[in-house]
Amino acid sequence: MASQRNVRNVLEVGANRVLRPLGYELRDKVLSERPEGFPGYLEAATQSGMDVNDFEEQRLGWRLPRPTLDEIVFPYLREDSVVCEIGPGTGRWSRHVVDRVPGGELHLVDASPWMVRFLRTYFRERPNVTAHLSNGQSLPFERRAWLDLIFSANTFVELKLGVIHLYVEDFARALKPGGYAVIDYIDPTTDEGWQHLLTQGAEMAPVYTFHTPQIIDRVFQDAGLRVERRYQVGKSTFVIARHD
């Protein structure tokens, strides 16, 4: 136990030396705020002199957002659209979305206090971007019928059906008539989804969830959203649903 504490302390000292000038510190409190691996990515990016989102794409090999956004998000946006993104991480997708709504608003929602603080700092020069802390199963807004589009990538792939149901009910409340919800899940009836199930390994088995298209359709339809189409990107099946 003592050796584990010593290792942890050494890691914290090194990380804090890099993160403190940026307004962050790596402590047990930070780790309890569910930032996943992002503090480490930020530290490594800072040491490399890179933007953290560029680091995630260029060094970690994460999928580039633009081709997917071009297909399933940008066609539904106007310059003055009001958009909500759930689970934005460090803003890899968000930084492209905000450029498409110069006269609109982008609301970023995350359940991690660390992520929310980071996003507020990262987008501090973008006055039309606001980061909000959520409870991880609903939108932190009381307003009705005010969003043009709700978007999420790589978040709902980890959510249980009950939580997805709660979110979709919130989508119906918050979206304007004619607004869209675009989220991804893992569909085990697709070749890509099934292969992910077979190859994810023991460590990731507790992380991802798998839902059939019939179940996802029913969740959206019961909430008053009509599924218009799907789009496959790797393991993810994006569903595009309209609030009539």
Region spans (language model):
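A short acidic, Gly/Pro-enriched loop at the edge of an enzyme's catalytic core
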Residues: 141-150
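Class I (Rossmann-like) S-adenosyl-L-methionine-dependent methyltransferase catalytic domain
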Residues: 2-80, 86-141, 159-166, 170, ...
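A short SAM/SAH-binding and catalytic strip from SAM-dependent methyltransferases
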Residues: 149-162
